[in-house]
Design a protein with these regions (language model features):
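Core catalytic alpha/beta fold that binds nucleotide/phospho-ligands
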Residues: 2, 16-40, 48-246
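Extracytoplasmic copper-binding redox domains, predominantly the cupredoxin/blue-copper superfamily
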Residues: 6
Length: 246
């Protein structure tokens, strides 16, 4: 079934068309740019995961148009990046957040950020939106292959990582003995390791406390956390979303 999402709000000018199953392709952003969204909904919760993994297909002209649509503070941040890849990640991660807020919560105002005790960004709006918005959470992660954004009414963390060459010394540093054995025995240790890495990084971003000294035992320490891991092997990346159970 095809469905169109549209808005006349000039602050969020993107049109989404079409929607097919769980995959949503944004056919036009400022007339030309393209995105792919894969939403998920947690049981009984307002939550969505959005993925943009066609960064290589975005042209310089599309990037220029995207940057021009940003609020001034975000535009200035994007333009501080020397290379185009950094500008893409900065611009489109913000636009992906705008799209997520619009689709999940019907919020069309472009947000700004405030920062919590440990430096984790929080949403901030200029207008007097409903009290619900004070309890909205988001997290963004990006690598060369993809940008992932998750929005929720509960604390949440996300990490997306490129599947790179397996580094045994790094694996010994971040995995406990049991995890290291599983990775070493895997037919594709680089994939197995990247899964563990995204899970641990997503927990770190969920808690907002930064990486602690007990990284090898992080999954055991936070056994009250639910993890949703997706392998996108054809695109060369893996992502994990973390939130608290209950």
């Amino acid at each position: 079934m095809e469905k169109d999402f549209k808005t006349e709000d000039p602050l969020c000018p993107a049109d989404i068309s079409p929607v097919m199953g769980r995959a949503i392709r944004l056919a036009r952003l400022l007339e030309t740019s393209r995105m792919v969204f894969l939403p998920i909904t947690g049981e009984g919760r307002g939550e969505g995961l959005f993925i943009l993994d066609n960064l290589d297909a975005i042209t310089s002209e599309e990037l220029e148009a995207a940057i021009a649509s940003l609020p001034q503070w975000r535009r200035e941040k994007a333009l501080r990046f020397k290379f185009e890849q950094g500008r893409k990640e900065c611009a489109f991660s913000y636009l992906l957040l705008c799209q997520a807020l619009r689709e999940v919560y019907r919020i069309t105002e472009q947000p700004s950020f405030s920062y919590g005790e440990h430096g984790k960004p929080e949403l901030s709006f200029n207008s007097q939106l409903s009290p619900l918005t004070s309890q909205l959470f988001f997290n963004i992660s990006h690598c060369k292959q993809a940008i992932a954004c998750v929005v929720s009414d509960q604390p949440v963390g996300v990490d997306v990582e490129r599947i790179g060459r397996y580094n045994e010394s790094l694996a010994r540093h971040v995995l406990n003995d049991s995890e290291f054995a599983l990775v070493s025995q895997s037919p594709d240790p680089q994939i197995s390791f990247t899964r563990f890495w995204t899970q641990k990084e997503a927990i770190v971003k969920l808690t907002g406390r930064g990486i602690d000294d007990d990284l090898p035992n992080l999954l055991l320490k936070y056994n009250n956390v639910s993890l949703h891991t997706e392998d996108h092997l054809d695109k060369g990346y893996i992502l994990t979303v973390a939130n608290y159970r209950g």
